[in-house]
A protein has these predicted regions:
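Switch II of P-loop NTPase G domains
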Residues: 66-122, 129-138
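Conserved GTP-binding G-domain of TRAFAC-class P-loop NTPases and closely related GTPase folds
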Residues: 114, 121-125, 130-284
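Conserved G1/Walker A P-loop phosphate-binding module
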Residues: 1-69, 84-89
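Alpha-helix-centered segments that form part of catalytic cores
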Residues: 59-78, 160-177
């Protein structure tokens, strides 16, 4: 009797949320066979070029370019541990454009529904350095006479706050999966990933959940109030450890991409092995 298990992790995030570098760095670590997890040899996907392209760029000391909308295809990264338990990281929308469309159009297509139905765990990528505070009567400046006149002629569009966007997204995914919020959610396991953690230069031992509570309180309390304590986590992630550009970075050239990158675990501790987080992501 086969005692191995398979877990399915759904990767969720909009454009420029950090999924590209995460996928490439995870792929590089799995390929190196230096860690507890490896790419499943019998289920190796035929098309992993998008991950390899990221690694090639990083090996040159350059950032990987923004994934084009034309790359909105489904990608799966299948791995297994030393006991041959399998984990599938699914990227149904690698470029992230469809995530925006889901919320804007209140519609989830058939491909997304398949991935949602079979998922055990979700990774929600939130790029923490691009969260914009919502203007209100307290922090909004007085508009100029020209701006007032412009608003009289054309009413500005209503902008949904970042927190409301993510909450709406999670509510739609839960609805499609048939998960009620009347009771605390145990499955799917949820990991909120605060990506590009290195950009804001947080103090050492900063707790990721505290940052989420300050920057996106609506999302923070939605997660805290609806998921069971042992079925969700909030972590920080820097896939590249430093900001890269189109100019070569000598440190990356002298070393290898898998020597860079780290996570900040829920306790605020820095861990350089990105694969360490896999157990908590799948709810082990």
């Amino acid at each position: 009797m086969d005692s191995t298990t398979e877990k399915n992790v759904l990767i969720i995030g909009g454009p420029n949320a950090g999924k590209t570098h995460f996928g490439g760095q995870l792929y590089g670590r799995l390929n190196s066979r230096k860690f507890n997890y490896k790419i499943a040899p019998h289920n190796r996907p035929s098309d992993l070029t998008i991950f390899q392209d990221v690694l090639d760029k990083l090996s040159e000391g350059k950032r990987a370019g923004h994934t084009e909308a034309s790359a909105n295809r489904s990608i799966e990264l299948k791995l297994e541990d030393e006991n041959e338990n399998k984990i599938v990281f699914s990227f149904p929308d690698y470029a992230g454009e469809q995530v925006k469309s889901i919320v804007e159009n209140r519609r989830i297509n058939a491909i997304w529904k398949q991935y949602i139905d079979r998922s055990d765990s979700w990774m929600l990528f939130v790029r923490i350095d691009e969260i914009h505070p919502l203007e209100d009567i307290i922090n909004r400046g007085i508009p100029s006479p020209e701006e007032i006149q412009k608003r009289r002629v054309q009413t500005p569009p209503v902008k949904v706050s970042d927190g409301a966007f993510f909450v709406e997204l999670l509510q739609m995914l839960l609805y499609v999966k048939g998960v009620s919020t009347f009771n605390k959610i145990n499955m799917p396991n949820l990991t909120v990933v605060l990506s590009c953690w290195d950009v804001p230069t947080f103090p050492e031992n900063t707790i990721p959940s505290e940052i989420l509570m300050k920057t996106l309180p609506l999302l923070y309390y939605f997660v805290k109030n609806n998921w069971a304590e042992n079925s969700h986590s909030i972590i920080g992630l820097s896939s590249t450890e430093k900001t890269l550009s189109d100019e070569p970075d000598e440190d990356y050239i002298d070393r290898t991409p898998i020597d860079f990158g780290y996570i900040i675990n829920p306790k605020g501790e820095k861990q350089e092995d990105l694969t360490i987080s896999i157990n908590s992501i799948v709810g082990k």
